[in-house]
Amino acid sequence: MSPSIITAPGISSTVRRCIEKETGKEFAAKIIDLGAAETGDSNHMLEATRQEIQILRQVMGHKFIIELQDVFESDAFIFLVFELCRQGELFDYLTSVVTLSEKKSRYIMRQIFEGVDYIHSKNIVHRDLKPENILLDDNLNVKITDFGFARVLKEGEKLYDLCGTPGYLAPETLKCNMFEDAPGYSREVDM
């Protein structure tokens, strides 16, 4: 595959557009640099990435969730190959159009709700839903992505850890960090 960068590098990863030489088909490759982690953290990053891969495989096949095509591992890197969403992030789209008609808003929100409902039907909580983690394909169909904070829940399980993006945290998540007697949270933080 031949790469070109399509998003800004993250703390330990970069997403590049790649072309499969045999077919000419384009993909997005998330390249996770295990060497970028502090000593001892690379094992944690490796395990977290493997958990994300496992969750991506559990939600595979839904039309509003990003499709993981393949995974490659080396000693220093993990490559996650995804379908390419040419329109980029929902955040950037909303910024560029400034206003959105009620009809188009309903179209996008219905897809997000349908995707989240499917994720929840698999007993998974995403925990980092935001416009930056929702991609758009050529037809403006949404693709929920970035399952790095996602967790598979056991029946009746509550979570207490603080994770997600500060400006988008659900009140239930914040309560767990602020009050010792907080009841915990589950799938409701995705809504």
Regions found by a protein language model. Name each.
Residues 108-109:
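Activation segment signature within eukaryotic-like protein kinase domains
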Residues 14-36:
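Glycine-rich ATP phosphate-binding loop
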Residues 66, 75-83, 91-92:
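A conserved loop-to-beta-strand element in the N-lobe of protein kinase catalytic cores
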Residues 114-124:
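Protein kinase catalytic-loop region centered on the HRD/HxD motif
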Residues 70-71:
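A short, aromatic-enriched beta-strand patch in the conserved N-lobe beta-sheet
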Residues 32-60:
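Conserved N-lobe beta3->alphaC-helix segment of eukaryotic protein kinase catalytic domains
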Residues 91-100:
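AlphaC helix of the protein kinase catalytic domain
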